[in-house]
Amino acid sequence: MKVTDQRYRLGYHLMTKGGWMNDPNGFSWFKGYYHMFYQYYPYAAEWGPMHWGHARSKDLVHWETLPVALAPDEHEDGCFSGSAVVYDGKLWLIYTGHHLTNPADSEEFYQDQNIAWSEDGIAFHKYEGNPVLRAPKGNTKHFRDPKVWQEGDTFYMVLGSQGSDELGRALLYKSPNLKQWEPVSVLDKAVSLKAEGYMWECPDFFRLDGRDILLMSPQGLEPQGDCFHNLNQTGYLLGRQDEDGRLQRKDFTEIDRGHDFYATQTLLAPDGRRLMTAWMNAWDSPMQEKEDGWAGALTIPRELRVEKGRLYQQPVREMASVRSGKLLDGKLAAGSRTALPSTSEAQLTFKEAWNYQGTLLKLGDGQQELTLSFDPKGSRLILCRSTKDGERAAQILPFEELSLQIFVDRSSAEIFVNEGEITFTERMYWQGALSLELRDIPAEKAVIYALEAETNRY
């Protein structure tokens, strides 16, 4: 699929050279490169039979697109989401095979788990003994998105599932060799349809800072106050796994409070960091770039940590390498307006925000705007964009200073609040020159960088 217009193409986010992209898959480290795979349909800017696109990077920022890693064949109608592990000197992909039982009805299907391997991390071979895992009894047709990791000599898999009670759940399996799998437990399941949904997609289970964390994307949650206003959500359960393999945990918490964030995938990097990326769209996103022959992108990689009982996320330190020039290092006055390059980073610190009520800043081109406001009565940060269903809000912990780190990339904005306590991820289809406008309180510290305008190599 050929891109016909560059107007919305991103500068420093991973994209395809054309066609459709959704979930990140197989985030891994192999033979000196970070590898990122993703759900991909190369023949149209619409969802279609799923392939695995593939890119690699030395630094998490500059990506080289590689040949398609997996494609549908006579055995499966789609290669759905999954993960990657290094084993026996090879890079192994673990993915969901999607099988249509009635080509005339996309809702008639079954799913199973499969593996493929590569010696060089580029050319992959599907295992002749696929599938390696079929859905258990007491499960519906929803059985997908395996995330695999290794502990000692044992591989573990967490898998998204729907039980016969039509509630979402995460299943845990183990294997000595990626080929023979046996069940360990139902790691966790939804407490109710309304609160935690009918299906848990893209689960990811790991220990971080002494806590066990289950990331997933539940479907079917109903809005509750400021929470759960996207079509589908992404968030986490934080707790501890017990001796029976079950997660004893707190309530589900959204991990990003913007409109355009779904289907996370993490990697335990060689240096010990837990890194995460996600699809920087959602199934109800407008995706205006489809008019130009492409759709979808991934967020900038983020480093995770647990702090104050929450999962925090910040841009990986490698993002500093895309700074091409410092445009401002000082203060910004109340009421000021500052021009921003279409690929830029702004770091702002407000010292008077806790007692302020109203709009803090506006970011936009005069037609499409993002505004960020604060409500001290509810300790709420409120983000509004000039579209239908434009408001999203999150409660913030008490602070002395409010710090914002804002990444702008032509048709996207990612906002990190107070060192990653809250994030908002947005696709914004700006047409004109961008500016950052402060309202009634100044930024006591302001640093603005221009960022590289092209980090993808196709």
Positions of the model-derived regions?
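Beta-rich accessory regions
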Residues: N232-Y458
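Beta-rich carbohydrate-recognition and catalytic domains
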Residues: M1-D145, Q150-E196, R207-R257, M280-D329, ...
